[in-house]
Amino acid sequence: MRVVDAICEILKREGVEFLSCYPTNALIEAAATAGIRPIICRQERVGVGISDGFSRITNGHQVGVFTMQTGPGAENAFSGITTAYSDSVPLLLLPLDHARSTSQVHHFFRSAQAYAPVTKWTEEITLGNQVSAVMRRAFTLTNMGRPGPVLVEIPADIATEEINEADLNYTPVKRTVSGANAKDVAAAARVLLEAKAPVIVAGQGVLYAEASEELVELAQLLAAPVTTTLEGKSAFPENHPLSLGTGAGVMPLPVHEFLAKADVVFGIGCSFTRHSIVAAPIPPGKIIIHATNDERDINKHYSTDYPILGDAKSVLRQFIEALKDIQGTNDPKRNGAVAAGIRRLREPWLSQWMPKLTSKEVPINPYRVISEFMKCVDPKDAIITHDSGSPRNQLVPFYQAPTPRSYIGWSKSHALGTGLGLIMGAKLAAPEKFCVNFMGDAAFGMTGLDFETAVRCNIPILTIVLNNNFIAAETRHMKASHERYQTQALGGNYSEIGRALGGWAERVEDPEQVASAIQRARRATENGKAALLEFITSRESNYSRMGE
């Protein structure tokens, strides 16, 4: 048995069914022989994104795996891996390396060294008979505590080394979580009960812990409104009366106003990272309760009054029991009053945006595309993701995600084009869902040729390209350069590219045809075809920013 065969047997025991990859790597042939489906991407960063999206939707119960060749293959994967690292996504990365006899030669790229700052752990297999121990450590670290990408480098001579089958003594690893200190929870629970205007901030830790039901129960016990971070979007049902919406660089008005008036802010499953894109800023003067599974989050950017360490589901259950012991059941009148306060803010805010959401202008306003999409697609049946820049800023405040993992939020590391790989991975994880990524023409230019991967590999996603032939999100930063050299101008017919790559594609220029085009595209995906809709849109650059 060769080392690569042993690795593939371990992958099978861990439930891995496909291997996102790009040659050359001996693992690809070994995986196919072992019955693991190789999915060949067109560019390594997208291949990582496929594994990333898969891991997010499965909450790490099945870990996405990506393998690539040494040198340029590993180098091309960098932005995909940094996205997974910044968003704490459990991934297993298996790059080939040079043979041990030459791996230390100057100028040879070493994945384990280069990726150390943007992975949870890196390790090289130095002895073939240690493959089980190395892979056991790798799978343990992907999901234990704060999840993250783990990289195992495989020297070329080790990859094909013969080992004894007795060396393959591998049992799938078990995940474990821990609760919080009971005294810490009791003290924080009393603070929450005494608060006049508490607000809950939920992060993606709630999603990975599969704790949305507990979060709803806690919110109703406290009559506390809930906002999520961008990565945490869908952790709390956004159609719930206590939902404020997603708090990020753009947000609905209720998020901004309720945070401003809060006396206590309870962060659960979030890192409280001060980041202009993914999280609403916490105003000064608040009492902060912070529950996280990573001690590095505590006091990172905000001074924490009540730090709590533990798994989000376990911690929420502890809070619920503590509150019931003190208070009993929830108060419907208080819940109703808070919900009414949210409506009083949300309705006029939404009314201000209705001219754009219902616009009949040509080129089509991108907000009209989003509005029509929300009308004709049941969000419970879909998984949606944005891309960087305008599509994210336009989609996030208005699209309501009602169920866990019905939206993939990302952007701590916000490389253009990331959404395409993520949505392919989501479709592989949840083939019954209508999986859609919204991207701009700039993002399509970065990764759009991997639409062919979706076509070739029978991954029937819908890619919506909002094409304004312009880099609109950077307008305020590029005035002089654009006036003199047209630096924001772009061009291209992306529906023609989609058809040329073998997919179903259509270009839409009439706002009255938006809804019917979306329905046609959905039917194409239901018939097993990857679909691309190109909407010719205006250079809309107004976003629902608060506090500017």
List where the protein language model places each region.
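A glycine-rich phosphate-binding loop feature that marks nucleotide/adenosyl-phosphate handling sites
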Residues: 153-157, 389-391, 536-538
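N-terminal alpha/beta PP-like core and its mobile active-site loop of ThDP/TPP-dependent enzymes
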Residues: 1-330, 376, 453, 460-463, ...
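Active-site-proximal structural scaffolding
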Residues: 219, 259, 366, 388, ...
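Thiamine diphosphate
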Residues: 102-104, 249, 299-301, 307-309, ...
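Phosphate/pyrophosphate-binding active-site segments
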Residues: 3, 129, 165-167, 284-388, ...
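Conserved short loop/turn motifs at secondary-structure junctions
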Residues: 203-207, 358-359, 440-442
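Active-site phosphate/pyrophosphate- and oxyanion-stabilizing loops and adjacent acidic/basic residues
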Residues: 52, 113, 216, 371, ...
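Active-site diphosphate/adenylate-binding microenvironment
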Residues: 4, 12-14, 18-34, 344-421, ...
